[in-house]
Amino acid sequence: MANSSSVYDWFQERLEIQDITDDVTSKYVPPHVNIFYCLGGITLVCFLIQFATGFAMTFYYKPTVTQAYNSVSYLMTDVSFGWLIRSVHRWSASMMVLMLILHVFRVYLTGGFKRPRELTWVTGVVMAVITVAFGVTGYSLPWDQVGYWAVKIVSGVPAAIPVIGDFMVELLRGGESVGQSTLTRFYSLHTFVLPWSLAVFMLMHFLMIRKQGISGPL
């Protein structure tokens, strides 16, 4: 017991752990806060589940047009609890989108976007866009008929934009047509670019909430 106390004292002297703990655990919660104010936190939990299950699947998934579908089939049928990992990933993705939509509605209806919380709202909107991008890129990774044609349609949408439309289509596809380069880019976006982008904006979002507190009632 004395050893654990001395270890704690060592860290306390250098990092002031107790002050951090007191700040986290003693934050004032306004009396008007109810269960609907937990929707943002539930969205965060869904993201963490997505991260954990997605990381687990990267050990088996092969991002090539010839092996992607078979690797997903192998995960679902031969890997122990692979079906459960992928199913939880898919279910938590749907839950994350639903909780995000409800969270946006709650913030809007309670006026949480108003001054001085405009930047908190902006970071939230950016995270909503990133979440949609997660869905689009993840949908394609099994590289089945549904995934292939979804990518072909989605990546072709920017073609309607004047001047830069064709360039954006080629940037998304990695060439003139949908193929290996497209799958590689979508896989990179889904497993690296988007998660880190979302994590950065989440940190900004939470720090601003921490600084400004929860918005008051209507």
Curated annotation (Swiss-Prot):
Reported cofactor(s): heme b; heme c
Major localization listed first in the record, in broad terms: membrane
Pfam families in alphabetical order: Cytochrome_B (PF00033)
Binding site for heme c: C38
A GO term for molecular function: electron transporter, transferring electrons within cytochrome b6/f complex of photosystem II activity
Bilayer disposition of the protein: Multi-pass membrane protein
Domain of life: Bacteria
Residues annotated to bind heme b 1: H103, H205
Family annotation (InterPro entries): Cyt_b/b6_N, Cyt_B6_PetB, Cytb/b6-like_sf, Cytochrome_b_N_euk/bac, Di-haem_cyt_TM
Subunit and partners: The 4 large subunits of the cytochrome b6-f complex are cytochrome b6, subunit IV (17 kDa polypeptide, PetD), cytochrome f and the Rieske protein, while the 4 small subunits are PetG, PetL, PetM and PetN. The complex functions as a dimer.
Entry similarity comment: Belongs to the cytochrome b family. PetB subfamily.
Protein name per UniProt: Cytochrome b6
Organism in which the protein naturally occurs: Prochlorococcus marinus (strain MIT 9312)
